[in-house]
């Protein structure tokens, strides 16, 4: 997977990817109060299409990705835009978690790439502060798009991993959106439960 995304890094900022990142960014802005107080983890943040606009509003953003080339693009854009409150880490958090916890984790079109959903959700829980939130943007599973998620299943899985206040919405749907087929992009928001 690392090699695949290194290869895509220089062409990743296509009009479609920019459009989808902007959609997710606007949804995050609507969902989260007082972004200026928040320390955010962008998991699998790639070229920074979501992290950089969020950093302009948030207290800080940590962009973590396993692709060195994607991170190079992010760093370059942050320098060009003079964004200082962002750090970049080439790290697999499933193998080497951070000691730091965050108010908010954003995961945009990354979760369907993760081979172990359970381990990934547990890792998100570990990296969130008490009452912290995870925002997952990804594709709805359909007959033609088996890489996505059935929302009820994802919501149930989040509940199993001690998340509550779980809410999902469809942000956008279009032909050719994912792998050449009709697809719908959803946003699911969940809060780390106090019980865990």
Where would I find each of the regions flagged by the language model?
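Class I SAM-dependent methyltransferase SAM/SAH-binding core
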Residues: 47-95
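A conserved beta-strand element that flanks and buttresses the S-adenosyl-L-methionine
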Residues: 106
